[in-house]
Amino acid sequence: MAFQLALDALAPTTHRDPSLHPILESTVDSIRSSIQTYPWSIPKELLPLLNSYGIPTSGLGTSHHPHAAHKTIETFLLCTHWSFQATTPSSVMFMKPSKFNKLAQVNSNFRELKNYRLHPNDSTRYPFTSPDLPVFPTIFMHDALMYYHPSQIMDLFLQKPNLERLYASLVVPPEAHLSDQSFFPKLYTYTTTRHTLHYVPEGHEAGSYNQPSDAHSWLRINSIRLGNHHLSVTILESWGPVHSLLIQRGTPPPDPSLQAPSTPMASDLFRSYQEPRLDVVSFRIPDAIELPQATFLQQPLRDRLVPRAVYNALFTYTRAVRTLRTSDPAAFVRMHSSKPDHDWVTSNAWDNLQTFALLNVPLRPNVVYHVLQSPIASLALYLRQHWRRLTATAVPILSFLTLLQRFLPLPIPLAEVKSITAFRRELYRKKAPHHPLDVFHLQQHLRNHHSAISAVRPASPPHQRLPHALQKAALLLLRPISPLLTATPFFRSEQKSMLPNAELSWTLKRFALPWQASLVLLSLSESSVLLHKLFSPPTLQAQHDTYHRHLHPGSYSLQWERTPLSIPRTTAFLPFTPTTSTAPPDHSEASLPPAFASTSVPRPPPVASSLGAQPPTTTAAPPTPIEPTQRAHQNSDLTLESSTPIEPPPPPIQSSDIPPSAPVLFPEINSPHRFSPKLPTTPDFEPTRTSPPPSTSHQDSTDPADPLMGSHLLHHSLPAPPTHPLQSSQLLPAPLTNDPTAIGPVLPFEELHPRRYPENTATFLTRLRSLPSNHLPQPTLNCLLSAVSDQTKVSEDHLWESLQTILPDSQLRNEEINSLGLSTEHLTALAHLYNFQATIYSDRGPILFGPSDTIKRIDITHTTGPPSHFSPGKRLLGSQPSAKGHPSDSLIRAMKSFKVSGNYLPFSEAHNHPTSISHAKNLVSNMKNGFDGILSLLDVSTGQRTGPTPKDAIIQIDHYLDTNPGKTTPVVHFAGFAGCGKTYPIQQLLKTKLFKDFRVSCPTTELRTEWKTAMELHGSQSWRFNTWESSILKSSRILVIDEIYKMPRGYLDLSILADPALELVIILGDPLQGEYHSQSKDSSNHRLPSETLRLLPYIDMYCWWSYRIPQCIARLFQIHSFNAWQGIIGSVSTPQDQSPVLTNSHASSLTFNSLGYRSCTISSSQGLTFCDPAIIVLDNYTKWLSSANGLVALTRSRSGVQFMGPSSYVGGTNGSSAMFSDAFNNSLIIMDRYFPSLFPQLKLITSPLTTRSPKLNGATPSASPTHRSPNFHLPPHIPLSYDRDFVTVNPTLPDQGPETRLDTHFLPPSRLPLHFDLPPAITPPPISTSVDPPQAKASPVYPGEFFDSLAAFFLPAHDPSTREVLHKDQSSNQFPWFDRPFSLSCQPSSLISAKHAPNHDPTLLPASINKRLRFRPSEAPHQITADDVVLGLQLFHSLCRAYSRQPNITVPFNPELFAECISLNEYAQLSSKTQSTIVANASRSDPDWRHTTVKIFAKAQHKVNDGSIFGSWKACQTLALMHDYVILVLGPVKKYQRIFDNVDRPSHIYSHCGKTPNQLRDWCQEHLTHSTPKIANDYTAFDQSQHGESVVLEALKMKRLNIPSHLIQLHVHLKTNVSTQFGPLTCMRLTGEPGTYDDNTDYNLAVIYSQYDVGSCPIMVSGDDSLIDHPLPTRHDWPSVLKRLHLRFKLELTSHPLFCGYYVGPAGCIRNPLALFCKLMIAVDDDALDDRRLSYLTEFTTGHLLGESLWHLLPETHVQYQSACFDFFCRRCPKHEKMLLDDSTPTLSLLERITSSPRWLTKNAMYLLPAKLRLAITSLSQTQSFPESIEVSHAESELLHYVQ
């Protein structure tokens, strides 16, 4: 420890490096050895675990391995552990020869290797099979013990009498007996199926293998016994799932307790040594505790194990919070459940933990601690606590005494009157003479000279024969001296008194209750004890013990007692009889028989599978036993050198001393992992196989001795993928087919109940009813039953019961009926039952339902709503409709009846589209100007064409729109998923005679070419296929617009208005695939509303299937595809010649085209179909792709997609495409998430329309019930005052006074655990209601200046568009002028300076990124360089010089002050924003949000200062949204530092943090001098210019105050690892991080003191702004500092310095009148003067109240603006506001009137108000939030006494 402290003191690297050199030298050899022995690259999360096992791996390896940790454990087992155990020549079994050779090089005692092929995979590991058993007395079995039964190990020892020790490695999770959940899931996982445990090492599925599920029983036995044969089992070591066991021969040693003395002494301190000891083993698991079982419930143990640290933290949290809600424990658990360290905890365990914590919150220990109290008080407390127990104990005893009187009568002494005397005269005397000893009957004994016992007569009663013990004792004592007693004065008679006197005596009386009463009392007492036990709570001690046992359980330990195992018989170790061998065999392959290596070993059922070329090492599957039938069958075909016939084996050895109740650790069953040495027998059952066996024909035709037999056995083909498409029934549930109330096949209703029905009304599918009615309740939406009941006079209940006799229950109770009500299908069934026909009058016209062969008729009206509704009777109309229909009616009827491949067109009705003249005029205007389209730009002057040019035609259309009204045209919309077949049915429709007069409009030439090819028309008809521009110039009866959403907005309206002959429009498109965006920055087409929302009501059906995409893509979207090809989703490094390339930009597309590849942009590929896999190019623009473009790219090809480019763009990070990442990782693409506002409104259909059913429902669906996420809904609004979910509310202690903490009950559950919610220790300062009296000054004299006159000519006339910039071909919008009001000058006053409005300027943040952010080159943390350390030290020394501090002196940490800072920080966070704002930002405390990730957004502001007035485009200020954890943890650190800075700061240094304008004025008047010039400085990109030296400076500042080290490390980690949605950032300053202002101010002050010899010169600093009173000399070391700085200075020598928007000088400070004048102009034109006037007035009064001296502060150029502002306030302010310009002190009532209804107040205006008014104003929700609260600053000043 002392050496470590010395190292920490050596800060300079020149001193530290030599000190560390010996340490480095001592570690070189160990690191080199570790890298050579364990060269594998181990995951960093597993490295600490391996080191804790004692494995010396450094983690610096570079070789990759699929399960590197297992490989490391295996290497340690072989080369270290086993090598140490192999002290004599030994044999090794089940190991690859190459690995054995390396092992033999480590230790030469490893002499021979024996391998046995018992599994097909063994042929890849073992080149040969050993025919005999090992010969050495020590054997090492490598990873095979889990496949062997103890009876087989016993057989091995019996076959090899010289075998003494068997070292075996066992790979089995010790927790396998608990559940299938691993305690170390990163190291291994496993599952148990029946009797098989499937083990997966480190997620490597190819290296997984199977083993018996009872293999873990090897860890539960300590010996194996068979008759007189004993084997001891010892666990030598465990490394997680790998265990080293030693099985050795011999009788186990006797228990030491048998050798101890037989009669130990009671006081023996070593008494436990003489008791039998248990053989207990334990295994390492994560630190966990076991939750108690729920009352009367059984929960699995694995689901009750939770991390101890989380449990303790949650226990403390639930009792520390003031108000606990039901959701708070769950939110606390969520914070920890996502941590990697807790991945072993099951979801049920997390659920049980939060439930356990929630339900046990009210429990508290019933204890008291009374120390300083009297014994009487302690006794009273004891009686109060234990009176029930004492009473319950005393009552039976007292009741028993009543019975004791019957058996042991006790005399009771009673007083008796013997004589009464008065005036010395005896009035009464008892007959018997009085004697003092009469009570003892001594006179009788003296006269008789016998004892009292002999004087008792035989006839005396029993109670007289038993004198009392006291009486007997007195007789024995007094009898020897009785003669002397008579002579004493005691027996002399005394002289009687004159006064009345009574003489009393004591007489013993015997008393006993009747035995009946005694029994009653005894029974009552016993009953009271019983009732006390049943109804009274446990005793205090029991409550205390139960509370701590229930709520503070101990750590869970995975341990058990090992027991001996007795086996009845042995089982053969090998499936064949081994030969006898005395010498190790030769391992060379030349000595092997040709056929032996592959055919001499039988094939057991497969236990493991390995598809990789590299077989597993530690996890490899060793040989496993096989079934009896297989072994016997294969043994009959063995070809061995010995010709001795195989004889039946001897009978197994039986054990007669097996206890009948012994635990069955290894069950004797015919499992696939065991075998028996018996001859072939018929098994009782077929064991479970992990892979299909070979066919019978193959076995019969294969010679077992064939050398190729092994390869045949090892060849198993994988199952082929299904070639048939996924049926639609697999997408949706089919309750009808599984309905138990139905019978028979699914058929149309008209076939099951044949009658004459109107067409397509009885074609719905159903089944025959098989069961009687179940009396289902009527649906809520039963308007159809009411309408039918009103017409037929049959009750609704009877109608409903009738439906239950003909339709199955699944068609009467489902989601459709619950949400939409009954439909016309049910009406058809009722019409059949009651023999009537119904006419439905709907928007589609009259429709008939029911059989036509009936004479009964009813009328029902259907209204579409919403909601839809059935009502009885016929709809009444005001007039008959016109007999003449629309010209397009015949076309629409033909479309409704048209079929393609037996399917109808997917639409319901044609919708009348009223054209919009404004939309059409917008588009034609942009076409005319060349902003959209190219027709107006075509040069036709050189051609021979006559007539108007295209531009002239467009102009004519423009003129035509000016004089012609709009019209209404029928529109039919076909919409569906990509590749659903929207185009093909329309192409077939257009080939019919009725639709021959058509034309097609396409967005691209590629799509037009596809139409031409598909229609196959004559060349003269090619004019019918057009691009979207040329189509407008042509005319036809029918217009088909393909990909309508890729057309400009307003195109539908323009096409209809431009063609008077047009009768019908058919539009095709998918609203999910995006819409048109103009490439011209001057186009105004984007100002029109989106066509996706405008055309959405025309979508009757959305086809949710595809004929194009392959199955792999269909699974992503969860959609049915008719394309049977599986397809691919992969990646390529270079494009293929035949594959189309899809790019993000036109430039990339042109590049690939020039390189010889077929390429187009993703957007332009919409509508195209590719046969080859589409190659998607990934580049920097991929992350900006919209969801629509991502959908287009993934659905273009019939074969799949391949990504080309950096994999980071599909890695699921901030810089990748979310949809591409889901596709690349085979994750489901949830459409509701990518299209939240559009997809839920689409009415999906999942299969083509085979019938055009006129089905009507009783309600209108709000969204299709198909493919809807159940969680897709808006969260309910919960009032902020909601308290019904409170579980507990802890009261405030009486001595604490009123509660000063703010409410936290409204905080999001994920944020509440981050609050300490500590009560402040300091008393809150009283709220001041006084106003600072102004100093008496002479009123300033203003030159006359009319505000309106100056404002009229202030703004020069200019074109605002010239001040905008282009970003990615899109213009910025910082100078909006269109439709903006103006009254002061010729243009809106808002054009004075740039306005940052992120909501109206999409380019604001993207265009500002390069200027405001600095990015790291990679995701790696920012590296602190040596220059950063040196510069940081220099700045720290300069900062200490500024504060007159010693750099080497540290300040002790003050915990009490830091606790106050925590409370203050939480107060600031809760009071700076409204409760609604905090709740709306609940995502800031999301546990899934990494604390190193910040969200960058643009600050909305209209900044007006000298630098922005009349300026051009300006980059916005970026704000960083950090996790609440960062703000609440590091915020107190900054406040803690600020308190010490306020104490140490010299008076000549001014920091503007938390200061009011009046304080600024006072300081200037006190410190600034009249010397000129003054040095004002500002920096360019100050935040971005701070690099690693700022982190070093901040860390040194915190170390000086001894801030806890973990907080310093957190700060450094955040600064060096910060990342955003745009990429990783350097350690630049972020506006929004804790202490931004303080750190910037300190950095600025440190730079100033590094540059100048300041001395006592007045200095003003505020962030990056600074002011020095007069020029100063430069320090000698400034050049060395300057060369390391990255700052860019903007020094200014001026006589009128500007600081924080105020002109300052010895006279005080005054607000910049030029900026204030501009703000007033903007407020007037924005019509916001009433909201802002008060703020501007209070800022103006700061300088106005200086009097005549204010003119010394202003430049001459600003005098007119100061006068104009004064003129403005005098003319525009009401009288009570003008009083603020007076020198007199404003009264509180006046200020209350002024601020009665504020809506907008600046920070400076708030500073000038009293505290009472500030608190009243901040309580109003409409006021803005301030990052710096005056109350917080005032509270900080109250904490200064801690450091004084």
Curated annotation (Swiss-Prot):
Keywords: ATP-binding, Host-virus interaction, Hydrolase, Methyltransferase, Modulation of host ubiquitin pathway by viral deubiquitinase, Modulation of host ubiquitin pathway by virus, Multifunctional enzyme, Nucleotide-binding, Nucleotidyltransferase, Protease, RNA-directed RNA polymerase, Thiol protease, Transferase, Viral RNA replication
Domain Peptidase C21: 730-884
Record site feature (Cleavage), residues: S879, Q880, A1259, T1260
GO process terms (BP): DNA-templated transcription; methylation; mRNA modification; proteolysis; RNA processing; symbiont-mediated perturbation of host ubiquitin-like protein modification; viral RNA genome replication
Residues annotated as catalytic: C783, H869
Modification after translation, per record: Specific enzymatic cleavages by the host yield mature proteins.
Pfam (any one): Peptidase_C21
A single MF term (Gene Ontology): cysteine-type endopeptidase activity
Binding, a ribonucleoside 5'-triphosphate: G976, F977, A978, G979, C980, G981, K982, T983
Domain of life: Viruses
Sequence segments annotated as region (Disordered): 571-739, 860-888
Keyword Nucleotidyltransferase in record: yes
Protein name: Non-structural replication polyprotein
The species this protein was found in: Turnip yellow mosaic virus (isolate Australia)
